[in-house]
Amino acid sequence: EIKVWDAENQTSDGFAGWHNPANAYEELQQAITELKEFGVEISKDNPIVMDLPYYSGADVYTNRAQTLKQSVEEALQGCVVVNLVSCADAKEWYYAGYYTESGKDANYTLYDVSGWGPDYGDPATYLDTMLGDGAGYMAKCLGLF
């Protein structure tokens, strides 16, 4: 059992609260079942393939991309494949999604460059990320505008 907080000892296990491979695989199986009803077949032989552009000019970004790929593919047991798309310089990486005019111009399935995000207690800092017409800090990177 994972304890988020141990009040008696004033400590936590320091676990990644969003990382739950068993739950991820269970959710994927549910999606596979539902998609099969629409004629969509997902399996190890016919996996979901997601493109992730990453900046290969720095080891930290390369390592992060490889770790994400390994984590997703192991947890989802080969039914999802992460295709790492190497961007030799930061400009190429930014133009894959961050510098696009709209979400429809983006060239990725997964992307980790979103610009500024919420980082303080004012509610506007969270709401401003999703402003309409592409004005939100993150709306464009999510492909919403």
Task: Give each language-model segment a name.
Residues 72-79, 115, 134:
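A generic secondary-structure signal for well-formed alpha-helical elements
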Residues 1-74:
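Append "and occasionally in soluble cytosolic enzymes with long acidic Gly/Pro-rich linkers
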Residues 66-75, 90-109:
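Short helices/loops that flank or line small-molecule/ion binding pockets
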Residues 53-57, 85-87, 113-117:
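Active-site-proximal beta-strand/loop segments in catalytic clefts of secreted hydrolases
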Residues 111-112, 130:
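Short, well-ordered beta-strand core segments
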Residues 43-46, 101-106, 121:
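Extracellular/periplasmic catalytic domains that process cell-envelope and extracellular macromolecules
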Residues 1-26, 81-94, 106, 118-145:
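Extracytoplasmic/peripheral linker and loop segments enriched in polar/acidic and small residues
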Residues 46-49, 76-81, 105-110:
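Loop/turn elements at helix/coil->beta-strand transitions in domains of secreted/extracellular proteins
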